[in-house]
Amino acid sequence: ILAGGRGERAKPITLQSADYIRSKALIPFAGRPLIEWIVEACRDQGIRRFYVVAQGVENRSQIKLVLGHGERYGVEIDYSRARFDPYNVGSGAATLHNLEQWNLTGTALVLPVDSLFEFSLDKLLAAQRDSDAVVTVAAVSRTPEEIAGKYGVMRTTAERLVCGFLEKPRLPVIEREFPEITQPQGPRTLATNAGMYLIDCARLRLAARTPELIRLAQQRLDWGNDLLPRLVGLGHRVAVEPIARLGDLGNIRDYLGTIGDALGGLYPQMDRALGAPASTEPRYWIHESSLRSKDHITGTTLAQKIAEGSVVIGPGVRIGRHVEIGAGVRLRGTDVGDGVDLHEGAQVEGSVLGDSAVIGAYAHISDSYVGPMVQVRSDARTPVRLEALSAVGDGAQLWSGTRLSGVSVYPRLRVPAVSGVPTGTQLTSSDDILQWV
């Protein structure tokens, strides 16, 4: 598991304070750190030995605190040695250096820690065996419009062997290089790299012992941009095998989209891990302790309020432990962490509410992230509104009347009743906030 990234694109989700970043592996996802889902999804397909490539003191200690050595999960987990951190320059270099460190010679699955995968290990193994490939690339099919300027494309033969790459091509280039996609009866999707690789460790280690790859592994060597093209250029067999789905978690938009897809049933492996929903029509999960919780105003339980219709839970909702929900609350497509307070009249859609967040009365939150311990001090007269990929970091406070659209608020900040802050603004300090007061 390649877990050394700093999570810069996902700020403020990855921030515990303005100057302390948590590992991407610990991004909260449906009630658990992301890396737990990854380990369990692999374990359930028969993988019992894990190697975590970490980077730096905080990254390594944070992950180890969650996973330990795998005892809780019935697996074995080892960690990269700290003295090799300076040599982990890029995902490809990190892989090659640690294959040598652990002296791995069998078959291994390499995957990043900031994505959610729906895949079949058996199909990847079969593709590797049938093609006699050094590397089998897990591929996701995407339309030209999805690919343009964002994803690299792989050229493949009829035998699903990679024969070339196009790095983030624009739409005209895609149409020129793949004319079949413009034909009425032609394919409408192309294979893109999902960032997951099944490798023959011994053969890959041998292939990497060329002067060029040895030099690059000391400078910068990424899987997609560097290692794969050079392996293909040197004549090594690199195969492609489609997987069902990939969800990126590296930025706010993709994070919210992926968790929405997961709660919407598009990741069957995660569905099984979540367990049976509390309701199948609409489909949602509510922990038993939350169904029994009484709000402090009406004194009625959540189960009673759902039954009488004063609280409406739509599809794609997960509610964690000991959540208190007031009358008039509406939820749809939202993940609600443990210990959250949702006061009367609050409406939340397409969002994530972190553990112990307090959402004030009549707040309107859509397509946004609200971190743990955030206080949204909304009221009926001056409600708070968050929308359009806004993100509020751990422990921040939003005062009544605040309206943010596509704005990020860093942890621990206190935001007064502001509006009109331009979309894309990052409020990282009190000085940033003062510009808009």
What is the role of each PLM region?
Residues I1-L2, G7-Y20, I27-K123, T156, ...:
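Conserved N-terminal catalytic core of the sugar/cofactor nucleotidyltransferase
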Residues S115, A202, L206, P211-V437:
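Left-handed beta-helix
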Residues K64-L67, F117-P211:
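Conserved core of the sugar-phosphate nucleotidyltransferase
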Residues R83-G90, P144, L171-V173, L246-D248:
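A short acidic, often aromatic-flanked loop/helix-cap motif at beta-alpha or helix-coil junctions
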Residues R48-F50, V134-V135, R237:
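Residues at the starts of beta-strands that form the adenosine-phosphate
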Residues A25, E76-D78, L161, R237-A239:
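Conserved beta-strand segments of alpha/beta enzyme cores
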Residues S80-A82, A138, E241-I243:
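Conserved beta-strand termini and adjacent loop/short-helix elements that scaffold enzyme active sites
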Residues D44, Q101-T105, E118, D130, ...:
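Alpha-helix termination/capping residues and helix-transition junctions
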